[in-house]
Amino acid sequence: YIEENGVRREVAAEDIGYVLSTPTVPEFLTGREFLKFFVDINSDSIRDPRPLDEYFAEMSIAPEDRDKLLKDYSHGMKNKMQMLVNIIAQPNILLLDEPLTSLDVVVAEEMKNLLRSLKDGRITIFSTHILDLALDLCDEIVLLSHGELEVVEKSNLDDHAFKEKIIAALKEESHA
């Protein structure tokens, strides 16, 4: 359930945004065409419509890249486009699969700052194998091991035995 303005309701499809670890964008379109298409088909639900170039600037997508085909974008640029449509849609729940995988240092830092800015007013859930990233960005951490979820107390993360437990779980997962 989601609670808005004191009213509890069921989660709807439009409440959820998703960013894949391997960006999935229509590679036959330019960045501008894709963004325009997204804005046009979602015009009724976009709360704060702005000119396309403002959206691109918010994600640090250079003017010379905006009219290139998405197939010519780097992994990081495609990831930015996925994030951008979710920023525009403003879902209540944002699901991110390994959001910093394969990103260069600059884009990864931009994404971390963006994720920090998106925390207010929504639920952001992401998967990661990077413990430091979880520590940096998350209010709560949950470990998935053997199909079971276990809440991780941040205070335990300084405990050597607890770190060993997490590393052992990750090793088992990589051999499964």
Model feature map: region roles:
Residues 121-127:
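Conserved H-loop
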Residues 22, 28-42:
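Q-loop/switch helix immediately C-terminal to the Walker
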Residues 108-120:
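Helical segment within the ABC ATPase nucleotide-binding domain
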